[in-house]
Every structure is written in C-alpha cells, then in structure tokens.
Amino acid sequence: MAKINELLRESTTTNSNSIGR
C-alpha cells in the first residue's frame, strides 16, 4: 500500500508541475 501511495503522490506532483501551479 505504501508503494501505491508514493506512486499516487508522484503522479499528483507531476500533474501539478505540468499545469505549472
């Protein structure tokens, strides 16, 4: 479960970075 959480967190960070927020 920890791995999924980390992956989700990285995905969110990448998405936020793509938007430039």
From Swiss-Prot:
- The ranges of region (Disordered) come to 1-21
Q: GO CC terms on record? A: T=13 icosahedral viral capsid
List the biased-composition ranges (Polar residues). Answer: 10-21
Asked if the keyword ATP-binding belongs to this entry, the reply reads: no
| UniProt keywords, alphabetically | Capsid protein, Late protein, T=13 icosahedral capsid protein, Virion
The post-translation modification note in this UniProt entry reads: Proteolytic cleavage give rise to gp24*.
Q: Which family does it belong to?
A: Belongs to the T4 phage capsid protein family.
Q: What does this protein do?
A: Capsid protein that self-associates to form 11 pentons, building the T=13 laevo capsid in association with 160 hexamers of gp23* and one dodecamer of gp20.
Q: How does it assemble?
A: Homopentamer. A total of 55 subunits of gp24 forms the 11 pentamers. Interacts with portal protein gp20. Interacts with gp23 that forms 160 hexamers.
Stated name of the protein: Capsid vertex protein gp24
Query: Which organism is the protein's source?
Result: Enterobacteria phage T6 (Bacteriophage T6)
The organism's taxonomy opens as: Viruses, Duplodnaviria, Heunggongvirae, Uroviricota, Caudoviricetes
This protein's gene is called gp24
